[in-house]
Amino acid sequence: MKLVIAEKPSVALSIAKVLEANDKKDGYVEGNGYKVSWCVGHLIQMANPDAYDSRYAKWNMEDLPIFPKEYKYEVTKATKKQFSILKKLMNESSVDTIINACDAGREGEAIFRLVYTEATCKKKVKRLWISSMEDSAIKEGFSHLRDGSEYNSLFASAQARAIADWLVGMNISRLYSCLYQQNYSVGRVQTPTLAMIVKRGDEIAHFKKEKYYTVELLTDGFSLSSERIDDIERAKRLKNKVGNTIQVSDVTQKEKTTNPELPFDLTTLQRECNKFFGYSAKQTLDYAQSLYEKKFITYPRTDSRCLTEDMITSTVNNILGKNDFDTGRIKMVFNSKKVTDHHAIIPTISSLQEDLSKLPESEAKVYRLILNKLHASLGYPLKESLTKVVAEVEGFSFSCTGKVIIEEGFTKYLKAYKAKKSEELVLPSVSSGDILHLESSELREKYTAAPKHYTEDTLLKAMELAGTEMIDKAVEVERRGLGTPATRAGVIENLIYKGFVERDKKNLLATHKGINLITIVAEKFKSAETTAKWEMELSDIASGKESKEAFLRRIEKEIQSLVEQYRNSI
């Protein structure tokens, strides 16, 4: 008998259906030589400090730092019943093999391993690693089960991340709460993210707008604008020197080619859903996860934007169908070397036969965007003709740039998501030396623009790129930044939940509480560079290049140093 453990009931039932295990029991399904059960997210959590020593129930600076020799775990209260069911099933004599069917990623691996360890199970483990919940993908996955030990390094990385978060949260939060007599929460990823939001707010608050001027000339069907002029008297003199005509000094034409972007990873999907639909990062992740479990899209928690080369035939034949595509894009989109644990997010083949009206509108929007993005990624380039007309008066240049679309290329798939304003500006045919008759001239007063507050779109991009200036350019992009594609939405929501950040329409603003925290926290624990470096090291642990123990020792050393610094200053 084989026991299959999935991450959620809905996923377990989909797997059970494929395995023809149809006999429903309390907390599992049985049949055809399988028992299929499920976790309910994280059944096991790290214990709080008072589980190690009752004195830690009170927050005292004298007790810091807290570095357990062995970390304790406990079953969450809400999931005790399901854990008991899993423990009983795992230790039944009839079960000889456990199949880990939790989500194929770092957190999915951790969810299963912690249950397996807490249940004191010693049985053989196999790993189901799939990127789609389609029946065909599940069958294929079960025919190629991997040995569970292949993912030991992935679990070590998950453990290291959880322990690092615990160490920073339990020690640094207590340190500042004790020092300032206020309940502060410091997080390994959360606090550097908050620091970016606070810094942007500070830049906006202290921004001093600068006034400048331009002279605008309206001629036959278009207008020419001068360069920026800082002095109003100089701008007035220029306007007064302009007569009823102006001579064209230069006309340049060039063709601009824009290639399409690659299909979505989770971060780019979240960014575009925020930009186009106003969805939060968490909403997009929830909608995508639901679409995955309904077999409409492939695994969403991916950091890859390419597809594997063995997917070319099925994608071209079944998803692209009769739609025209650029064969020259094949090598860009289908590149196995650029795929990590999972390929880019695309629609499943079976979803193309489904009625989208059965989906909630929010999920249908996300699905259509994913489908259109895939079509666009394999589309032809956008080709535009750019014409720049320049005229001069008293050494000042006036110019206008026109744009005409020659071939719309991939943009035909993305028209629904673009601004409605005209993207073309057609200029009349003019040549160098031509005399243009002016209809009017106008002096315009303008101001330099302040930086914009972060939206979830721009914050996700900033989190993805944070700390990269400190990292060797040869390092893969997916190993940089604050958090991972799967965790960034939770970080943003947590900042809002804890009162450090608030939403103002699409903007994310730091609260007084958030600003106060960043004011007092040491640079090391609010630095994007530090956290990006730690994220790289976690990736190295997952690939077997770094040890969990060495990583955690370095973090303990940083915490010890900070605690002693404050203790000695009191």
Q: Which sequence ranges carry the predicted segments?
A:
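Conserved short loop/turn motifs at secondary-structure junctions
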Residues: 1, 101-104, 181-183, 253-262, ...
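Intrinsically disordered, low-complexity regulatory segments
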Residues: 1-162, 166, 450
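Basic, low-complexity terminal or inter-domain segments flanking catalytic cores
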Residues: 2-3, 90-96, 118, 173, ...
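Amphipathic alpha-helical transducer elements in NTP-driven molecular machines
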Residues: 9-16, 33-36, 40, 76-87, ...
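Structured, non-catalytic alpha/beta "coupling" segments that mediate domain-domain communication
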Residues: 25-56, 191-234, 375-426, 554-564
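C-terminal or mid-to-C-terminal helical accessory/interaction module adjacent to the motor/catalytic core
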Residues: 71, 84, 93, 135-219, ...
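Metal- or metallocofactor-binding catalytic centers and their adjacent structured scaffolds
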Residues: 232-264, 270
